[in-house]
Amino acid sequence: MKSIILFVLSLLLILEKQAAVMGQKGGSKGQLPSGSSQFPHGQKGQHYFGQKDQQHTKSKGSFSIQHTYHVDINDHDWTRKSQQYDLNALHKATKSKQHLGGSQQLLNYKQEGRDHDKSKGHFHMIVIHHKGGQAHHGTQNPSQDQGNSPSGKGLSSQCSNTEKRLWVHGLSKEQASASGAQKGRTQGGSQSSYVLQTEELVVNKQQRETKNSHQNKGHYQNVVDVREEHSSKLQTSLHPAHQDRLQHGPKDIFTTQDELLVYNKNQHQTKNLSQDQEHGRKAHKISYPSSRTEERQLHHGEKSVQKDVSKGSISIQTEEKIHGKSQNQVTIHSQDQEHGHKENKISYQSSSTEERHLNCGEKGIQKGVSKGSISIQTEEQIHGKSQNQVRIPSQAQEYGHKENKISYQSSSTEERRLNSGEKDVQKGVSKGSISIQTEEKIHGKSQNQVTIPSQDQEHGHKENKMSYQSSSTEERRLNYGGKSTQKDVSQSSISFQIEKLVEGKSQIQTPNPNQDQWSGQNAKGKSGQSADSKQDLLSHEQKGRYKQESSESHNIVITEHEVAQDDHLTQQYNEDRNPIST
């Protein structure tokens, strides 16, 4: 390294003397020619041929100067380094060292560039591209003592927005930078040259994030632009609630987003893991539209009003009113896989609503209305003595050819009034899929947990239209010493109704898997409804009355268990032949 540096310095001194001689000749004659200056010189029997080209750009006040030097020697062991240095400070010190033959040293930043042309033995030198606020055109004579030469103020490297580029005509380049606030690029200067680009950027830690608007009363409106490649924001906190929302815009771009939204003092924390995999040919339109309006009022002895109208996505809402002893966690894994050819339109619209109350009086209410999606309900740690976690995977797989239209639509309107001695009125109107409803009014120390996985599999060819429609009207009155009235009107559905009366300190867990499979060819119109699962956990002296009117309902299972002082687990699987295991 030292020998190379000494060689470069000696070469610079020789070129400086030659430049001084040419400057004196230029001063006597007026000015050198503007295109290029050629000067042959000799050293130790070797012939050097120097050529300088200047190139000006006209974009944004920037300019580029290209210096190309051809060294016609046969000794390939010689290397030439071009070192760039602060030319303004050097120009103030002495004017005779403004242009040191195109090889410039940058002692502040310690940048080195090495150029080798292994094909013909020619060494190609550097280009410094200064991108500043002013356009400096430089001079055509490098040895003029006037301060406006290319080595003057135009090539200052003290500015923070200075961008220096090395334009290399050869095959390789080495550039070492010891500064973290400088940009180095290498680009090809001509059309037939090789382009090597190296760029180092120091940014103030900016990340691409989605837009989330949060208000005090629980109004949420999430707008996600899916043109971003990947958006990830992770925050760790000890808040006991989890909530997430994943929405896709109506574009053919699929994005996986992992977000944790942490609120202050509201005990909301969101986490979602969703994977949408679509394999197919000529999928013309795949849309995920969604809209949501929520209004929630949660007080100790007051009512809770919740309205949810959504058209698509996977949406989980969790609300807790906790006196410091409960923990709630919801995790959704959803996979929608579509394998098919020539699928013209596939749309998924779903909504899911969960509302939870965990007070000292132990009231917990959960309702999920979803369409082609997943509703997960979990309540954990009542009075600090129990903990439950439910993970519900749901897979909707559609295999088919030439499926023209598959639509899932749902709408939900909910109004709830939850008091200690008052009634509970709940109305749900939904159009098609899984409806999970759970209400708890517990005066003791019990816990209820409902898990319903659902799988919808559709296998068919040339399925023109598949629609799922259902309607349900519910009215419930849950009082301390009163009765429970439930009315369910459904069409072509599978309805599960379970009522359990627990007086003591029991814990009940009831998973209800439901599988609906449709298969056929040329199915023009199919209508059906998934399960509406309702569970009421009452205390002491409560009566249950169910009225169900359905045209094609089947597979009704009622299971009652009463266990005191222990945790009881009931697993109920409802399939085609209804096997029950406890």
Curated annotation (Swiss-Prot):
The gene is SEMG2. This is Semenogelin-2. Sequence repeats lie at residues 70-129, 141-200, 201-260, 501-559. Belongs to the semenogelin family. Residues 24-59, 132-160, 173-194, 228-248, 269-582 are annotated as: Disordered. Keywords: Glycoprotein, Repeat, Secreted, Signal. Seminal vesicles, and to a much lesser extent, epididymis. The keyword Metal-binding does not apply. It is found in: Secreted. Semenogelin-2 is thought to form both the 71 kDa polypeptide and, in its glycosylated form, the 76 kDa polypeptide. It comes from the Eukaryota.
